[in-house]
C-alpha cells in the first residue's frame, strides 16, 4: 500500500515538473485547456441548429482547430425580456465556462436583449460577437467593453455616401438625419471622414445645410422651406422607415423629388413605401443571412483562439456569476485577438476596427424606379488585389428623378450673382459719385462697398478692363449680377488659426477670397492671380490674361543738372582731390622752406640769392599743375620739392585724363535703361546691399516669395518693407523712396507705359495668370471658362489689352525720346558756364569789396593826417609859450646874477644853484637842474662870457662836442593817440 502511494506521488511530481516552465521556457500546448465552450444566444431554432452544426464541422477543420482541442456549443434562446435573458446567460452559459458568446438580434425591433447579454458578459470580460445588432451604441467601448459584430453599424453608411458623391462629382450636399444617437453618429462620421481621407479639396464634399429632426415625424414642411432656398440639390437622408415616409410625402408636395433633385438614402429609408423614383439607396449584402454570420463569427473566434494558444496561456473562463471579484484577463486578451482578425468568410472579407465594428462590408447600390421597384446599379465591395473597398456604379442604368437619364448637376444654378471686385488700375477704376449725380456713366457700373451699412458707401462707380469683361461675360452666359467692392480693400490671404485646440492649424482667409470661401459672394471679377494656395479653397476659370511678376523702378535720370560735369567723380573723390591740392601745396612749401638748397645764387655773381617758395605761391603752383595752366613764377627751388612737383604733375595728368574719359561716358555714351538686371540681380539677392525692394502684404506675389526657397533671404529683407496697397508702393517709386517694387507685370507695364520715368527691369518670372474666382463646386465654372476661351479666340481680350493696358501713343512717345542721339548741348554743360559766370561774379564782388575797403582806409588816413596836423600845431604853440617863459626866466636869472656879482657874499646857496637853469632842446621845454649852467652855455648862449668872467653881449662861439642834456624828454610825430 505504501509503495503504491509512493509510486502515484512520483507520477504526480513528474507531471508537475513537465508542465512548469524551466528557466523562462515558453509554455506548451498542454498549458491551455483542451476544450472550449462557445455560447450562443440565438433567436430561432434554425439558428441554434446551424450553430451546433457549424461547431461540429469546425472540430474537423485543422486549419482553425489545433490538435487535442475541441469546441462545444452551449446555446439558449433569445428572450424578449432582457432581465430573463441575463439570468439565462448566467445560469446556462457562464456556469458552463463559455469562452465567448455569439448573439443575434432580438425578436422585435428595439429589443434590449442583445445589450443585456453584452452588459453581462462584458462584466466578466467574456467576448461577445453580434451577428445582427447595428446600433451605434454598441460601438461605445465604455459600455460594451467586449462586444464585436460581423455586421457594420448603420452610421458606417456615411463612408459609402462619400464614395458615391466622389463618383458623381457632387461637392455640396444637404444632410437630413434624426436627432437620435445613430443620426448624429452618421453626421459625425461623414464630416470626419470627408476631412481626413479626402485630401483633394476639389473632390471633398461639403455640407451646405444640416437638417435635424425629432423621430416620429408628423410634418417636415418647415425644414423643406430652408432646403429649397439652399443651393445644393443633393439630399442625404438617414431616417427610420416611418420618418422617411413623412419626409418623402412633404417633399413631393414641394416638387422636390422630381427632375434636378438627387435623393441618396440609407437602408431604413430605402424601404419606405413612397421613396421617390430616381432615388439611390444602400443595401447591406448578407444583411439577413444569419447562417452566414453565425459561421463567420465561429470561425473568427476559432482563428483568434488558435493564435492565442500558440502565443500565451489561456486561463479557464469564469464559472460563477455571483463572484463579482472575477477578473478574467485572458478574456480581455482574447478580445484583442478577435479585433485583429482578417479572414474571408461567407459574408465577405471579415475584419474589425478598434471599436470591434465590421469593416470591408459590401453594399449594393439600389436605384428606385417604376414605383418602388429596386434595381441594383452598383456595388461597394472589397477588392483583394488593392486590399480596399471599391465603388463600381453603372451610370447608364440609373434613371434619375423626372425619369432623366442624364445625371443632374446636383445644385441649383442661380442666375443672379453677387460679384465682388477691387480697385486696381487699369483693371478697375473706382470713382465716387458727386453730390449732384444720381447714376453712373454708360461705361461704368455701380459698385457699393460690400455689406456696408453706411449710405455713402453706395456712391461709387466702377469701370475698366474687368468691368468690360464682366459686362460681356454676363451677356454671353446669361446671368445678372450685383457688383460690390471688397470690404477691406484686400485680395485676401490666409491666417493660421487653432480655435478648437486641435493639433492641426486651420487656414482662415480674409479679403475677397474669404468672402468667396465663406459663400457670401458668388464670383470675383478682378485681377486675381491663380496660385496653389487659393486654388485649394476656390475655383478658378481659365486665365483671361497671362502675366508674370516683374520689377518696377525709376529710370536712371538722363536729365542733365547744373552740376552734371561733376558726375564723372563721386563726392568722396572730389573731396579727396581738393584736400590733396592743399596738402601737396603745404608739403611743397615746407620742403622748399627747410631745404638747405632752397635759396642759392651762382658763384661769382653779384645778384642776390633767390627767394624760397612761399605758401601762397605753393598753392598757386599746385592748382596750376592740376588745371594745366602755365606757371610763370613761384616754382619750387629745392630738389626734393621739384621731385614732389613732378609726382604731382603725374597725378594731375591721370586725374584729368580720367575725368575727361568719364565725362564723355556720362554725358555722351548710352546709359543703361534700368539699374537692376532682374530677379537674379546680385544686389537683390545680397541682403547687405542698401537697396530697398518691396511688394504688397498678403498678395499672390508675397505668397510666391514664401514658396521659393532660393528667395528666402531676399523675402526676409523685403518683408518689413511691404506695402498695404500697390498704389502706395508705385508712388514711392516715383518719389525715389522705394528703389524696386515687385508686382504683377500687367499693372507695372501699364504704369511704365503711362509714365516715361518708370521702367520694368529684367524678364518675367513666376508666370501665372489672372482668373475669375468662384466658389468650390460652382456650376458656373465651366460656363465661365468656355466663355473666356471664346473671348481669346475672337480677339476680345486683345481689344481690352489695347484699350486699357497699353496706351500706344504714350508708349511710342517714350520710345522716340529714348532714340534721340546722345550729343552734348548747352543743357548738358550749362553748369560749366554757370561756374565761369560764378567766377566772374566772384571776381567782380571781390574788386568791389576791395574798392570799398580802400575808400574806407583812405578816409581813415585823412582823419589821421588831420589829427596829426592839429597835434603838431598845438605842440608848436605849447613849445613857443614854453620858450617865451624860459627866456623870461633866464632874463630874471640874469638880472639876479648881475646883482649877485656885486655882492657875492650876500647871495644864498639856493640862489646860486638856480643861477644857471637847464634849458630844454629847441624843439621843446626841458627840466632845469642846479649846476647845469655850463651845459646851458654850451647849448644856447645869448651872451658871451668874457675872459674876466663877466657876461656880455656878443657873438656866440662855435660849440665843440656839446654834452647831452641830463634829461631831455622827446616828442614823437605819431599823434594817433590824440585822435578821438
UniProtKB/Swiss-Prot annotation:
Key words of the record: Calcium, Cell membrane, Disulfide bond, Glycoprotein, Ion channel, Ion transport, Ligand-gated ion channel, Magnesium, Membrane, Phosphoprotein, Postsynaptic cell membrane, Receptor, Signal, Synapse, Transmembrane, Transmembrane helix, Transport
Summary of subunit composition and partner proteins: Forms a heteromeric NMDA channel with Nmdar2.
Protein localization: Cell membrane; Postsynaptic cell membrane; Postsynaptic density
Pfam families cross-referenced by the UniProt entry: ANF_receptor (PF01094), CaM_bdg_C0 (PF10562), Lig_chan (PF00060), Lig_chan-Glu_bd (PF10613)
Binding, glycine: 527-529, 534, 700, 744
Signal peptide from the UniProt entry: 1-24
Family: Belongs to the glutamate-gated ion channel (TC 1.A.10.1) family.
Task performed by this protein: NMDA receptor subtype of glutamate-gated ion channels with high calcium permeability and voltage-dependent sensitivity to magnesium. Mediated by glycine. This protein plays a key role in synaptic plasticity, synaptogenesis, excitotoxicity, memory acquisition and learning. It mediates neuronal functions in glutamate neurotransmission. Is involved in the cell surface targeting of NMDA receptors. Plays a role in associative learning and in long-term memory consolidation.
Name this polypeptide is given: Glutamate [NMDA] receptor subunit 1
GO cellular component entries: NMDA selective glutamate receptor complex; postsynaptic density; postsynaptic membrane
Topological domain spans for side Cytoplasmic: 592-648, 850-980
List of glycosylated residues: 255, 311, 342, 394, 451, 478, 498, 690
Membrane protein topology class: Multi-pass membrane protein
InterPro entries registered for this protein in UniProt: ANF_lig-bd_rcpt, CaM-bd_C0_NMDA_rcpt_NR1, Glu/Gly-bd, Iono_Glu_rcpt_met, Ionotropic_Glu_rcpt, Iontro_rcpt_C, NMDA1-like_ligand-bd, NMDA1-like_N
Gene from which this protein is expressed: Nmdar1
Transmembrane regions listed in the UniProt entry: 571-591, 649-669, 829-849
Residue span of region Disordered: 948-980
Biased composition (Polar residues): 970-980
Residue ranges annotated as Extracellular topological domain: 25-570, 670-828
Record flagged with keyword Ubl conjugation: no
BP-aspect Gene Ontology terms: behavioral response to ethanol; calcium ion homeostasis; chemical synaptic transmission; ionotropic glutamate receptor signaling pathway; long-term memory; medium-term memory; olfactory learning; phototaxis
GO MF term list: glutamate-gated receptor activity; NMDA glutamate receptor activity
